[in-house]
């Protein structure tokens, strides 16, 4: 059980120390105090690596999210590093942004997501997975990008073919920054092919399948194929 220690009125005549269990804390303490928490995991606590590719069920989501295998490849392509800022355009439940922040000390992320329910899910996920500094913009791109700080990396997981989204993102990205875009529709894939021809980078296809029960046997069920474009702005 996690333990709390409260040090109150330090250095004064009324200096006090309080100790107890976080679960059963009932003591009244002075307003001016220092709180120390000894975090002790419960028997059912889940331990997650900081390596990209958390289980899908680690996130609250509505089914529309970047699945684990593709997410791991996306985080690898983005190459998080300390104190770097990511824009996650079409952030959904926040899975990419949150894994970016978990992967490198001091890394920050801003999500751009117009759907209110998904914004709320992403806020919950950020707190529960240890990325409380994740911030989110409740606007569509490109309008929601205008006042944001310059990013070191950008991920476009939604809205790629919307008018002005890519141009605004590419203009904002700092020189030397990385942009990764995932496509599952033919229209967005065609756009990535054109961008790859014009700007270079790497264009990959990600195929993934997962075993499911088929009666008393099992078979491999494929996920939607993802085309991924990665480019560094020169």
Predicted regions mapped to residue ranges:
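Conserved SAM-binding loop of SAM-dependent methyltransferases across substrates and taxa
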Residues: 93-105
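Conserved class I S-adenosyl-L-methionine
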Residues: 83-92
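S-adenosyl-L-methionine
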Residues: 112-153
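Core SAM-dependent methyltransferase catalytic element
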Residues: 34-40, 215-234
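Short beta->alpha hinge that forms the Motif I/post-I loop of the SAM-binding pocket
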Residues: 113-118, 158-161, 184
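Short beta-strand element of Class I
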Residues: 106-110
């Amino acid at each position: 059980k996690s333990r709390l220690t409260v040090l109150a009125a330090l250095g004064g005549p009324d200096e006090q120390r309080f100790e107890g269990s976080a679960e059963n804390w009932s003591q009244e303490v002075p307003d001016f105090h220092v709180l120390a928490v000894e975090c002790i995991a419960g028997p059912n606590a889940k331990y997650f690596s900081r390596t990209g590719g958390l289980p899908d069920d680690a996130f609250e989501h509505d089914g529309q999210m970047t699945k684990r295998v593709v997410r791991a490849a996306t985080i690898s392509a983005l190459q998080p590093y300390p104190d770097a800022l990511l824009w996650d355009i079409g952030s959904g439940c926040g899975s990419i942004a949150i894994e970016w922040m978990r992967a490198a000390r001091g890394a920050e992320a801003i999500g751009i997501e117009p759907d209110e329910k998904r914004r709320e899910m992403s806020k919950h996920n950020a707190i529960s997975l240890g990325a409380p500094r994740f911030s989110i913009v409740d606007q569509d791109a490109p309008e929601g990008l205008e006042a944001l700080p310059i990013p070191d990396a950008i991920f476009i997981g939604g809205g790629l073919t919307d008018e002005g989204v890519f141009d605004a993102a590419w203009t904002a990205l700092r020189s030397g920054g990385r942009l990764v875009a995932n496509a599952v529709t033919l229209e967005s894939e065609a756009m990535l092919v054109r961008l790859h021809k014009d700007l270079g980078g790497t264009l990959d296809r990600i195929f993934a399948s997962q075993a499911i029960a088929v009666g008393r046997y099992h078979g491999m069920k494929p996920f939607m194929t993802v085309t991924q474009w990665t480019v560094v702005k020169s």
